[in-house]
A protein has these predicted regions:
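Functionally constrained cores in energy, signaling, and assembly domains
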Residues: 13, 31, 75, 81-83, ...
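Short loop/turn motifs at secondary-structure junctions and domain boundaries
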Residues: 49, 67, 118-119, 157
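Terminal amphipathic alpha-helical/low-complexity segments used for targeting or macromolecular assembly
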Residues: 1-56, 61, 188, 194, ...
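Phosphate-binding glycine-rich loops and adjacent basic patches that engage nucleotide phosphates
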Residues: 1-5, 41-46, 60-62, 90-99, ...
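Glycine-rich hexapeptide-repeat left-handed beta-helix
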Residues: 18-20, 112, 119-225
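Short, flexible segments with low predicted structural confidence
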Residues: 2-7, 53-54, 70-72, 82-83, ...
Length: 225
């Protein structure tokens, strides 16, 4: 499994209250079936800066929740996070501090690290999105194979039927990109718009759908924001 990134290689776990769960998992996808249980265990650790808004749903009092947001528990929404109109939180979702979950974005069974952004028309299921990672408008993390078979990563069987993406800290995904089930993207890597990604992309790269280049100031633009 040498080409599959370990949890500590993708994520700085200081930027999520799911730290204890993730540190128990050598590979981050091992945490995906345990997200709901983790969230429920965290409820009793939340202080009075969180409000229980309904059964199994806790939202930081300084979070911004716009009208038209639907939240199903168990869910925790962190401090100064913004949930924009039409966001659909389907349960087993932990969103950290300072994150943005945008218009018509749908989340299910996810850990979203602090300051991550899923701001426009994104679907992210059975996934982990790292610190300050960003998915541009319409980028999708597909979590289920068409044939419903278990998902493998670089030939290694995960034993998971549903597994979307592990998106490393500071990684960027361009508009309209599709991340196939079981995708793992390294820290600070950039994915061009309209690209399909499958498997593992290492950190500090730029992927245009055909080739990987080292991330340098002269080959990085901001057109996917």
């Amino acid at each position: 499994m040498t080409n599959i990134p370990k949890t500590k290689e993708l994520f700085d776990t200081e930027h999520t209250i799911a730290k204890d769960l993730l540190l128990q998992c050598e590979y981050p996808y091992e945490a995906i079936p345990k997200i709901g249980e983790c969230i429920r265990s965290l409820f009793k650790k939340l202080d009075d800066t969180y409000e229980k808004v309904e059964e199994d749903v806790y939202i930081a009092k300084d979070a911004k929740v716009w009208d038209g947001v639907t939240i199903v528990g168990p869910t925790i929404i962190g401090h100064k996070t913004e949930l924009r109109p039409g966001a659909f939180i389907r349960g087993n979702v932990l969103v950290g501090d300072g994150a943005v979950i945008g218009n018509s974005t749908e989340l299910k069974n996810c850990i979203i690290f602090d300051k991550a952004q899923l701001p426009h028309y994104n679907y992210v299921g059975d996934s982990i999105i790292g610190f300050m990672a960003h998915m541009s408008a319409g980028a999708i993390a597909s979590n289920l194979r068409l044939d419903k078979e278990k998902i493998s990563v670089s030939g290694v069987q995960t034993e998971l039927t549903k597994f979307g993406v592990c998106l490393g800290d500071h990684a960027e995904v361009g508009c309209g990109a599709v991340l196939c089930p079981g995708t793992m993207i390294g820290k600070r890597t950039l994915v061009y718009p309209l690209v399909m990604v499958r498997g593992v992309l290492p950190g500090d790269k730029v992927y245009d759908g055909h080739s990987l280049k080292d991330r340098r100031p002269d080959n990085v633009s901001t057109f996917w924001h």
